[in-house]
Each structure stands twice: as C-alpha cells, then as structure tokens.
C-alpha cells in the first residue's frame, strides 16, 4: 500500500473516530445500552489507529523537515542533525507502516470476549479420557500464566481418570481471540499405562472454544426455556444429594440442552447454564460466519472446524506438531505444562497474513 493510500485510509477512519467521540457522549446513545456498548468498542479500536496515525503524520513531517534543512541550510552542524533525524525517521517509518496495517485489519468483535471451553474424550476410550484430562490441565496452567480466571461448569469423569467431558469458562482480557485457535481435534500417540506389550496407541480429544455471549448478543425468550433440576453429583459441600442444585436447560426451538452442576446453589447453576446456552446459540451464528470465511481462505487457521485434526502430541518422540501451520517442537513436557504460546503466536501471524490479503493492505 502506498503512502498516499495509507493516509487516505487513515483520514477516513479519523472522521469516523471524531463522529463516534461525539456519539458516545449523546444521552440518547448512552440510554441505548446495546448501541452504546457497540460504539464504545469501536471507539477503543479506532483510538489505537488514531494514535498510530498521528505518529505516522508526525514522522512524515519530520522527514520533510529534515530534507528541507539538508537542502537549504548552510550550517554543517544543523545539516548533521537533520541527517540523523532523517536516518532515524526512515528506519522507524516502515515499522510504523506495518503496525498501522495490522491495526487496519478489520477487528473481530468476538476476540475481546471471555470464552467457554469444552473438552471431550474422543476415540480411544479410557486413554482418550485421560488425554482430555491432560489437555484440561495444560489449559489451566496456560490460563494461570496469563492471569485469567478458570471456572468449571460441568464435568463427567473417566472410569480410570481424566474426563469423558469437561466444560469450563475462562475470563480475562482478550481470552477468546487467543484460545479460539485451540478448537479442533487433538491427537495423542503414547503407550497407555495398561499396555503390557509396549505398543503405542493413538487416541483423540475434541476441543471446542466458544465466545461467551452477553445478554446484548443473544435475546432468549423465557418461554422458550424448559428447566429441570435434580440432585447434584458434583462439588457442593453439605448440599450434595440433599437439595436439587443441578440444573438442565432445554432451548425448545433448537432442542439444545445444557447442564450445570458445579456451583453450590441452584440459582448459581441456572445463571451459569443460561450463560452457556447464550454462548452456544451465539456460536451457531458465528460458525455460519466462519464457514463463509473458510470458503474464501485456503488456510485452516481459526476457521473453528472442530472436526479438523489440528495437533498431534507424540510422547515417545517428545514431539508436538500443529498441522495447520506445519510447526513442530520437541518440548512436549513444556507444552503439556502450559507453554502453548509459541503455537498461538504463529497461528495469529498466519491468520493476519490472510486477513491483510483480504483487506488489500
């Protein structure tokens, strides 16, 4: 993108930034929570571009000033200062241009949301459940390293350990935009503890990452919800098996069912179940959008296809391979201890390359 084209794009967004700056102080807009929330998010995104654009224009002005000084000034000391200024500005300019191009990539409104993560043991029986437990611990350690809050909302334990299924929410800054890359089939190759012949078995677990929908994202008619309660089999202190704290919600129009039993009270479980239901309904629409994106792109990065095999964990070789970007590391133990950031960083870069092409940047 040429310098003039970049300035034209920045000018257009600057006008929008000024418009929103006025709108978010309008009492009528403030009274409309859905509109105000949307505009506030757009304002925060455009503020970053506004700041970078200001720096870019100042840098271009410094370059012109330095060139003018070198052409017109006879004082050698001033000319030397201008040469240094020009060299610094020319070094900074392409870096700032790339930063602006990244900011100009259309923002994904879901990326700032919290997330709901579902891990299910797939093929492999007991070994798959154990691997699902390993993945859960991996994500908990990763989330702890980021300062995020993890809360289990539902689980079903495996016969020999691990989980047939575990569902948990993750709250923090930019959670969904990072964890979304983990959606898909994770495959493990290792010798199970019960294997006497030393043969390597292959098992799998499926990870689904959903953006946590807010009430402004999805409107649910209370008449469409059927609630059933029962005694919880999960953590609940003295209340376990004495009061009906377990909640099952059925969304009648879609037949979707969610269960929550980890909280200590029926009210808390109902709130968590409603949150999960909103997110699942929101995810249906988001999946349609992602399918349209996937049809345009050749890459599998972040399309959210949960049937796609995305990563293999090979224990005998200490190897982890991400098949979407053909990236392999030989530090499996560190990865299982939560060091998944290198994969996520590489996936973000790969997706941004595709998005920059789409945005003609």
UniProtKB/Swiss-Prot annotation:
Keyword Protein biosynthesis among record annotations: yes
Positions bearing N5-methylglutamine: 238
Keyword Cytoplasm assigned: yes
UniProt PTM comment: Methylated by PrmC. Methylation increases the termination efficiency of RF1.
UniProt entry keywords in alphabetical sequence: Cytoplasm, Methylation, Protein biosynthesis
Family matches, as InterPro entries: PCRF (IPR005139), Pep_chain_release_fac_I (IPR000352), Pep_chain_release_fac_I_sf (IPR045853), Prokaryotic/Mito_RF (IPR050057), RF-1 (IPR004373)
CC annotations in GO: cytoplasm
Domain of life from the UniProt record: Bacteria
Localization per record: Cytoplasm
UniProt-listed SUPFAM superfamilies: Release factor (SSF75620)
PANTHER family per the UniProt record, alphabetical: LD18447P
Family: Belongs to the prokaryotic/mitochondrial release factor family.
Protein name: Peptide chain release factor 1
Organism for this UniProt entry: Porphyromonas gingivalis (strain ATCC BAA-308 / W83)
Gene: prfA
């Amino acid at each position: 993108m040429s310098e003039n084209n970049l300035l034209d794009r920045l000018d257009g967004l600057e006008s929008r930034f000024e418009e929103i700056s006025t709108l978010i102080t309008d009492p009528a807009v403030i009274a409309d929570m859905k509109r105000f929330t949307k505009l506030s998010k757009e304002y925060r995104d455009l503020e970053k571009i506004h700041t970078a654009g200001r720096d870019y224009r100042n840098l271009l002005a410094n370059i012109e000033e330095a060139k003018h000084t070198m052409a017109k000034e006879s004082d050698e000391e001033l000319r030397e200062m201008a040469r240094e200024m020009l060299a610094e500005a020319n070094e900074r300019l392409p870096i700032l241009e790339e930063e602006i191009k990244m900011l100009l990539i259309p923002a994904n409104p879901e990326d700032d949301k919290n997330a709901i993560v579902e891990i299910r043991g797939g093929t492999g029986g007991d070994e798959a459940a154990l691997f699902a437990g390993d993945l859960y611990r991996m994500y908990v350690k990763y989330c702890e390293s980021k300062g995020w809050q993890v809360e289990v909302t539902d689980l079903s334990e495996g016969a020999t350990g691990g989980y047939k299924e575990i569902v948990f929410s993750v709250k923090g800054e930019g959670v969904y935009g990072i964890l979304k890359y983990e959606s898909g089939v994770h495959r493990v190759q290792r010798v199970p503890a019960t294997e006497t012949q030393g043969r390597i078995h292959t098992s799998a677990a499926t990870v689904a990452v959903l953006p946590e929908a807010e009430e402004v994202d999805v409107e649910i008619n209370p008449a469409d919800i059927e609630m059933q309660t029962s005694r919880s089999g999960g953590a609940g202190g003295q209340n376990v098996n004495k009061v009906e704290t377990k909640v099952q919600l059925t969304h009648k129009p879609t037949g979707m069912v969610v269960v929550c039993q980890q909280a200590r009270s029926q009210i808390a479980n109902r709130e968590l179940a409603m949150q999960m239901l909103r997110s699942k309904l929101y995810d249906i629409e988001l999946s349609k959008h992602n399918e349209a994106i996937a049809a345009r792109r050749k890459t599998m990065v972040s399309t959210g296809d949960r049937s796609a095999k995305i990563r293999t964990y090979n224990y005998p070789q200490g190897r982890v391979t991400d098949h979407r970007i053909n990236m392999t590391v030989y530090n499996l133990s560190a990865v299982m201890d939560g060091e998944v950031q290198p994969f996520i960083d590489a996936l973000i870069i790969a997706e941004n390359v595709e998005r920059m092409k789409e945005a003609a940047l």
